[in-house]
UniProtKB/Swiss-Prot annotation:
General function of this protein: Catalyzes the reaction of cyanate with bicarbonate to produce ammonia and carbon dioxide.
Enzyme class at the top of the EC tree: lyase
One GO-annotated biological process of the protein: cyanate metabolic process
Name of this chain's protein: Cyanate hydratase
Organism field: Chromobacterium violaceum (strain ATCC 12472 / DSM 30191 / JCM 1249 / CCUG 213 / NBRC 12614 / NCIMB 9131 / NCTC 9757 / MK)
């Protein structure tokens, strides 16, 4: 298992993935089928935020017509965090920052794929957090972010 220390190779692969996805007119769901992984995980991996298991890397590479080097890179542990900027210092807020660093591009891609060009409102918005028992012991936080979709309007 390899780990990346520079973001450039994975960013170049992400660019190739997005180009192939568009050229072949595939959705992330199409690409994910048969991987045995969640749609969000595979999408995050294709956007450079996770490593894929070998079988999944080979399957998505075949769908996207990527080469052996790309298959190897899809399996490498990425240098995570795709959103530059200042880092919060409060530990709880930092964890949300970390979540957005890892899944922000995935959320953006899936929102645009499912809704079109636009945003999820943080004004017309509902947030819910629930504490639930974790079957493995302890507790889990279930956080629901419920925002109205607002399409971009040409002017």
């Amino acid at each position: 298992m390899q780990s990346q220390c520079q973001p450039a190779p994975r960013q170049a692969l992400t660019d190739a993935v997005i180009a192939a996805k568009a050229r072949k007119r595939l959705s992330f769901e199409d690409i994910n089928q048969g991987t045995g992984l969640s749609l969000a995980y595979t999408t995050a991996a294709l956007l450079g935020q996770h490593a894929l298991p070998e079988a999944a890397a080979r399957l998505v590479a075949e769908r996207l017509e990527l080469d052996e080097d790309a298959i190897a890179l899809l399996q490498a542990i990425p240098l995570r965090g795709s959103i530059p900027g200042g880092v919060p210092t409060d530990p709880t807020i930092y964890r949300f920052y970390e979540m957005v660093q890892i899944y922000g591009t995935t959320l953006k891609a899936l929102v645009h794929e499912q809704f079109g060009d636009g945003i999820i409102s943080a004004i017309n918005f509902k947030l819910d957090i629930r504490k639930v028992e974790d079957p493995d012991g302890g507790h889990r936080a279930v956080i629901t972010l419920d925002g109205k979709y607002l399409p971009t309007k040409p002017f």
